[in-house]
Amino acid sequence: MICIPIVGPIQKKSLEDIAAAEPLADFLELRLDLMSDYDLEALLAASTKPCIVTNRTKREGGQFSGSEEDRIEILKQAIAAGAEYVDIETSTPKQLLKPFLESERKSKVILSYHNFTDTPEEIGHLYELMCAMPADILKIVT
């Protein structure tokens, strides 16, 4: 499967990139943390492919600079707008992560971990912890 990231940084460029990626991709990843201007509903409507909405934190390689609550609110808006998938980090505070892991949800949840420095020795333990959470997909990047 091929997933092509859409990074903006503005709406017009994102829409152009969606149109260019559509014939090549199985999925599109809308990297909201890299966009300064976007209309999420319009981006989702522009794609015929399933979309993964990501709002990555700086600590895991992204650019979102607002509060953790604001970041999570944007992902909740993505669910309300009809995103097929949302990608949320395991490092998200548990009280903010919990609503994404409840059984009744409109979008599938990708629970992710990113470490671009090294592969931690406790990667097996991390994987076990992630498996215990009711996410649809687990993603570990190291």
Annotate each PLM feature.
Residues M1-S14, T57-E69, S112-E121:
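Active-site mouth loops of central-metabolism enzymes
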Residues Y85, S91-T142:
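Catalytic alpha/beta core domains of metabolic enzymes, predominantly
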Residues L44, C51-P99:
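Glycine/small-residue-rich loop that forms an oxyanion/phosphate-binding "nest" at active or ligand-binding sites
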Residues K12-E16, Y38-E41, E69, E73, ...:
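Generic alpha-helical secondary structure signal
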Residues I2-I4, I10-L28, E73-E84, L101:
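Solvent-exposed, well-ordered amphipathic alpha-helical segments
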Residues I18-P23, D37-C51, Q77-A81, L97-K106, ...:
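Acidic (Asp/Glu)-rich catalytic clusters
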Residues G8-K12, D33-S36, T90-K94:
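Short beta->alpha connector loops
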Residues I2-G8, D26-L30, C51-T54, E84-I88, ...:
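Hydrophobic faces of well-ordered beta-strands that scaffold small-molecule active sites
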